[in-house]
Amino acid sequence: MFARVFKAMPARASALTSVNASIQARFMATVRQQRTAHERATFTIRDGPIFHGKSFGARTNISGEAVFTTSLVGYPESLTDPSYRGQILVFTQPLIGNYGVPSAERDQHGLLKYFESPNLQAAGVVVADVAEQYSHWTAVESLGEWCAREGVPAISGVDTRAIVTYLREQGSSLARITVGEEYDADQDEAFTDPEQIHLVRQVSTKAPFHVSAADPQCHVAVIDCGVKENILRSLVSRGASITVFPFDYPIHKVAHHFDGVFISNGPGDPTHCQETTYHLRRLMETSQVPIFGICLGHQLLALAAGARTIKLKYGNRAHNIPALDLSTGRCHITSQNHGYAVDASTLPSDWKPYFVNLNDSSNEGMIHKSRPIFSTQFHPEAKGGPLDSSYLFDIYIDSVKKYKASQAAFHPQRDSLPSPLLVDLLAKERVGVQPTIGMQNIAAAATAAAAAA
């Protein structure tokens, strides 16, 4: 009996091998058919090299600032990060798209679980190779399908190492992606410089909205310059109910209704946000409220304090950048995405550097010497990326709670005080957590919820 079984095994193995080979052949034929169906695309750097490849996104032409990221994972988060607004993102990772694109599922707070904003923010995508067959339990579509649906052109089959080498040596440059067209050297007007555009105005919420914590212990005002969903989640998950305001909202006029103020990340040149800088300066002059800023928020806080910002040659965009905590001597691996930095030598005497970049010695944070105000250039919320510095949110929330306790004698009913809105409420906001409600309605909603419970 066993002899017959063992004798039959080679034949069965041979048949199984034949079936596997047939399946593999059909799979590869499908891949080749999909690849050959792609239209020609060109990635052109202004006054620089031209790269030819295949289009796998939207059939449209786009121009912007070409920048690169060395992040190995997290392309859904990177591409939906509002800080990439107006930029053509070049990935150094050789293969992108292998785990597809997840759904727009939301968590218990009503925040997006897998994206940093509802839309794809990058102007264009450049990769060496794109995975057309994806596999992940959260995936609902391919990277190419997502780019096409969002109207974002994407190109594959180009030498990204050569592109990054050029950008590293020459600096971030204007570039464009053209689909199905030849490059015309005389059409320089086709290059659009996003630095000349007020990008923050495009990505900031148009009206205030509120996100409640499950067990609210404090109330934080968030200045939205292009805030990432995981920043909001990092605050709410620590017991902070938040009200998110447009970037140009006069926050100093309503700060007395809040226990803390947070300044978010965002795209572009910080000097474009003059209204925000002015309001922050007035806030620090008129209030002792704790303040925390991240990325662009760090730069805006520095400008409000009287420091200057500089444009970096090619920026820092990665998930593995070392930043040294100057107060403890500890080194953190950080996630970063910025093209500007604070000139630490211009900090006023009542401020001091908090973190420093160990790669290029650029400033990575600052802290006030006597007040609960600090900021970081890197992203402590880091999705995707390392969480070495996520404790900074704990430090901030602790200072917010202490401030709230210190104000209890002066404002015993702080949580129920209405706060007048100084802008018209619109029906649609960037994050879309819930229908926009005025601050004057938040207390009523909270009272109704408590009565129902």
From Swiss-Prot:
One function term, GO molecular function aspect: ATP binding
Segment annotated as transit peptide: 1-28
What EC number is given for this enzyme? 6.3.5.5
* Residue span, Glutamine amidotransferase type-1 domain: 219-406
Where does this chain mainly localize? mitochondrion
Fetch the Pfam families from UniProt: CPSase_sm_chain, GATase
The family database entries (SUPFAM superfamilies) matched by this protein are listed as: Carbamoyl phosphate synthetase, small subunit N-terminal domain (SSF52021), Class I glutamine amidotransferase-like (SSF52317)
Its UniProt pathway annotation is: Amino-acid biosynthesis; L-arginine biosynthesis; carbamoyl phosphate from bicarbonate: step 1/1
Q: List the disulfide bonds.
A: none
Main enzyme class = ligase
Q: Which family does it belong to?
A: Belongs to the CarA family.
Q: Under what name is this protein listed?
A: Carbamoyl phosphate synthase arginine-specific small chain
